[in-house]
């Protein structure tokens, strides 16, 4: 609570919060002054009509009201000027408070006999408005409220204490006044504290939303570039539209549709050519590179290939290690797609040939091209990558594998489309791989017409480079040469356009500098000229938060009812939880206790009254017990189980709006009833001895005593208790405006009926008694309890009605800003579907450190390759399955189900890298802090291997469920390996996150040489898993391509059934 009572404004938000607070308090201040002015205007004719008096019969009342009308009209004019209000906030507030005090003492000491109960309600009005409607800080408001209370008590105590006729019952009345003022101060401070907290929360939500919106506007542009760089425009639009629809509908990752499949973004294209290219000799070269050199080398090479692809109207599909493949004829059909791919292949070979000649490094390019049809699109839910599938794609892959280094290897289908543009020669049978040999179709090698000329030109340069190479590592020499190509870095094009670093600062730095302070005589509109565009937007938002906006047309709110225009948002607002309800109830209980104390001080305390208060007291205790029962959790847990449900009661009240409304309404009605309960035990009419005609006042003074059943002094205090009843309605800040209007109107009618009709004779009797010694004299208008009460009832009614609407507006505004901020944050989902969460901030956004390529080396990463070899046999292209589309639909289900495992907390450390056909690649240990592994022992640093094993088993379980529903018998073949890797992002046109290293290569070999239903690991990984409690058994020594003879192990688990791996 200490924060709630801190002086305004907080230093860290000095400029914007000062302006915002002034604007938010201007409206209630204007309403306060307007109510006083209108009451002064209406009071004169209304009182004359109601009392049947001439206005001139009460000159003191007429003079006081006219002076108040003139003074407060002047103050209204000053407060309505925004410039003056911002410049003279505290002096103007102090002047209004002093004017109200002067008016109160004017009413007190004019118009007749001064009594202890006189003008208590008006001073209560002053106290409450100081807190709720004047733009003062909490400390200033509390000081004004306490001074107002003490001044009334001291002035009347001193004035009446010296008058013998007034000393009777003086102390109980002053004590009752003190209770009233104390309750008024507490209620006012409570109301101000909650409103300031709500205002501060709304202010921060608005600025956070603006900050987020500005940042997201930039990030959306970046995401648009990113999506369009990895996906064709039509597919990016389609996927983005569905994501936004899913977010708006609040659905899960799997949208509800007529079938139970995930959305499939795959289409068939005919008349395309597919190019596969592999850098021969790169694996050996990469083993000599540092992480930075490796990522730079790959980015330069593939960046150059991307430039060549763009020149020849080809689309890069994916990078697989050092393998590059692209397609021509996507997404738009091109008649020259075969020629485009062949030209690109030749240019790639020339680029590598120049590199080899210039550096002397023994690398080459092997290219394969085939023409046909493909299925293209995106599968899975995470780490989207545009891909192509078909038998023709498989054939193009084998064309590269069975090709010749430095040559472009094409099929007969591609040759037919070249139409003689290039000379070719038959490829020898010895170059064919088993797949091509089994196919039996002739293949061809394209003859490069420029190869001989380039070899002659490059001879001298090659000799020079070879001399330099004697003093430099081949990898370093190659890196130096590749830098001259100047390939663009990933996301470089995003860092120069609307950089978030320059546009997303939440508050301008100059707002906090001592040299730049707010001249409060200037309005926000005047400041617009001094501030830049970004700062001016903050003031625009602040002006939108002004409570006067509730009376202007809005696209979010209904002008009259303040309901949200969107029915769904209105429903969400009304159903939102309200944990603060218990505090509303507690403060209302304080009002009830104040009423009880006052009644005990000024009434004769009949038994019926005590019984009524006892029952009500028990009902309040029951309500508070229910509201605060969550704080009894520890106590209840130690008790019997039959009481464990008690803490859930407070949660039920906080989350059930219907129950809250019922309890709130019942609580307010109880306070209303108990405020006048003492009057309900009195007769509605009686013969008052003081009102008998022609009776000597001396006789009354000597022979008649007030009966105990007629406590006249309680009449004005019952009226004051009614005012507290009005205040109790303002304590429920989140209660709807229409319900507050209904309750306030009900209480206004009931109170006026009691004091002006059924029990008006009591007020007349009290006045007659006070003035019995002054025949012919009549009290002033505000000296009669019934008239005084009616006037103050109307004043409090209209004042609280205005505050209720303002509270409703700010509660709804706070809800609206929170919802907008939440929606804007949800829109960032796209980025995490392209890059790992720990990588994206370093490449895009305000956290981007520099223009260097992203690369990171890790000492211990576990890499998984999980393939479904049976899918290759399952895949077929026929009219029945729409040329393979339905087969891919099933693969999409499999990959999507695999992706859904990543959202489970236990697999939060698993990072999906990519999919390669029906092979799933993932890694653990990539989100560890770099360098952390070297500071810990091996067992602890590689503890995430167990997570990867559990993930592999979960993949098998998922596949088993799919088999059950699709009537298939797919089985996983999994390879695991752990060790050092290099991670990075390469490719400017299509940024792609990947990992490289011997660890990755061996993990891939563990999968390709594995056995269905088994997890194959290397000997080192087997030892690490055994230290974690897993059981492995030796498979023996097997031949692994590129690695020679390796001893491998199988993990003792069956991927075809669900369950955890066996642990020894």
UniProtKB/Swiss-Prot annotation:
Question: Keyword Heme, does the record have it?
Answer: no
**GO terms for biological process, alphabetical:** adenylate cyclase-activating G protein-coupled receptor signaling pathway; adenylate cyclase-modulating G protein-coupled receptor signaling pathway; cAMP biosynthetic process; intracellular signal transduction
* Known EC number: 4.6.1.1
Query: Tissue expression, per UniProt?
Result: Widely distributed.
Q: Which residues lie on this side of the membrane: Cytoplasmic?
A: 1-28, 191-582, 805-1064
Positions bearing Phosphothreonine: 533
**Where along the chain is Mg(2+) 2 bound?**
278-279, 322
For the ligand (ATP), the binding residues are 278-283, 320-322, 366, 914, 994-996, 1001-1005, 1041
Which residues does the record give as Mg(2+) 1 binding sites?
278, 322
Q: Name the keywords, alphabetized.
A: ATP-binding, cAMP biosynthesis, Cell membrane, Cytoplasm, Glycoprotein, Lyase, Magnesium, Membrane, Metal-binding, Nucleotide-binding, Phosphoprotein, Repeat, Transmembrane, Transmembrane helix
Q: Which residues lie on this side of the membrane: Extracellular?
A: 685-707
Q: Which reaction does it catalyse?
A: ATP = 3',5'-cyclic AMP + diphosphate
Domain remarks: The protein contains two modules with six transmembrane helices each; both are required for catalytic activity. Isolated N-terminal or C-terminal modules have no catalytic activity, but when they are brought together, enzyme activity is restored. The active site is at the interface of the two modules.
Q: What is this protein called?
A: Adenylate cyclase type 4
Q: Give the species.
A: Rattus norvegicus (Rat)
* Gene giving rise to this polypeptide: Adcy4
